[in-house]
């Protein structure tokens, strides 16, 4: 009985780690898809800022 319990514990822990991994991957996927949406918006803002900074730098040096 004790051996059977030990096997059960191992299989349960393997199962729960599998669930954790799949949840983790799903969570990462959600974060990645959300952050890519956010970064698309952020990239537009960053590009505008960079362009403005470059223009002002060129203006100063020229």
From Swiss-Prot:
Keywords: Membrane, Transmembrane, Transmembrane helix. It is found in: Membrane. Its main location: membrane. Residues 41-62 are annotated as: Disordered. Residues 41-56 have a biased composition (Low complexity). This is Putative uncharacterized transmembrane protein DDB_G0286087. It comes from Dictyostelium discoideum. It is a single-pass membrane protein. GO terms for cellular component: membrane. The chain crosses the membrane at residues 15-37. It comes from the Eukaryota.
């Amino acid at each position: 009985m004790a051996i059977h319990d030990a096997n059960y514990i191992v299989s349960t822990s393997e199962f729960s780690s599998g669930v954790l991994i799949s949840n983790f991957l799903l969570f990462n996927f959600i974060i990645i898809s959300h952050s890519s949406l956010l970064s698309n918006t952020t990239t537009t803002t960053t590009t505008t800022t960079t362009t403005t900074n470059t223009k002002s730098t060129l203006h100063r040096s020229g």
